[in-house]
A protein has these predicted regions:
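N-terminal Rossmann NAD(P)H-binding glycine-rich loop of SDR-like oxidoreductase domains
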Residues: 3-27
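Conserved glycine-rich Rossmann-like NAD(P)H-binding loop of the short-chain dehydrogenase/reductase
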Residues: 27-35
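Residue-level detector of anion-binding/catalytic polar loops
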Residues: 28, 69, 106
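NAD(P)H-binding glycine-rich loop region in Rossmannoid oxidoreductase-like domains
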Residues: 37-41, 47-94, 101, 115-123
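A short helix->loop->beta-strand "cap" motif at the edges of active sites that frequently abuts
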Residues: 100-108
Length: 126
């Protein structure tokens, strides 16, 4: 039986490439998406699409429950207000970690950041 990996940010540039790679390597993939992605973007290995966002604790628990690994790719590097970075990147990550702690405490957790985190001229995200 294939191991299950839960992925946030799966419909973005990095996340979509990651999901396809995981599928090629034999993982069963469960993704979080704000809305149902186009069928062409979804590899056959996706076993479930959990509709919700980083602020939806219930959806995050559904996403990670029973996962062997959780890869958190979701985040923002552009926002209208500085506080939006805090909500999406800090609070969203905190909620993902809380869901893992509650619903998949043995899962490996990988957090993928952005080049913008170390290049202040690219984004206020840094």
């Amino acid at each position: 039986m294939a191991k299950v990996v839960a992925v946030t940010g799966a419909t973005g540039f990095v996340g979509s490439h990651l999901v396809h790679r995981l599928a090629r390597e034999g993982w069963s993939v469960r993704i979080l998406a704000r809305r149902m992605p186009q069928a062409a973007l979804v590899p056959d290995a996706i076993i479930d699409v959990v509709i919700g966002g980083l602020g939806d604790a219930r959806a995050l628990r559904r996403l990670v429950r029973g996962a062997d690994a959780v890869i958190h790719v979701a985040g923002i590097v552009k926002a209208r207000h500085r506080a939006d970075f805090q909500v999406a990147n800090v609070e969203g990550t905190r909620l993902v970690l809380a869901a893992v702690s509650e619903a998949a405490p043995m899962a490996r957790f990988i957090h993928i950041s952005s080049l913008a985190a170390r290049e202040p001229h690219l984004s206020p995200y840094a």
